């Protein structure tokens, strides 16, 4: 069941050009003040049945959790990777995002002929991706494999935050805000200061006000 035909636009175009194994790539967690950035890569079969598949940001948490195992079960291949907060600080968030995407691609059990990457990263930055690829603006709305990758990346990151980081550092209440710069998060930072999982490069304005 394909919720919207346009979701397969990129895959149909790639198939018409002769690409067989087309992979979607997307990331999650670029904006939060803490934790790793995640990326996922997914190759979907033409006959997959993924009701309500869409960009993860347009899905409720319940729907993302429902789709997560279905994508894993039906995908020809899938992979999830992450780059830690410490490396984000050592380099920068864009480099970390590119590295996470390449790690996800490297983790696939099937080598893709073409990777479809969500967003516009053609200003020299996507050169870090060694797989043959195209950057698709709004890709998670016109590529089923990118949409599937967005779900895997988002759910994987949210689970890591709520099941691991929230328990390791309960005082910050990470499960409530997922690490984003909410009022609650800044209040906890004011009270406790940053923990090892915080991205210090993201806290420069906050630190300047202390």
Predicted feature residues:
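RNase H-like, Mg2+-dependent phosphodiesterase core
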Residues: 1-210
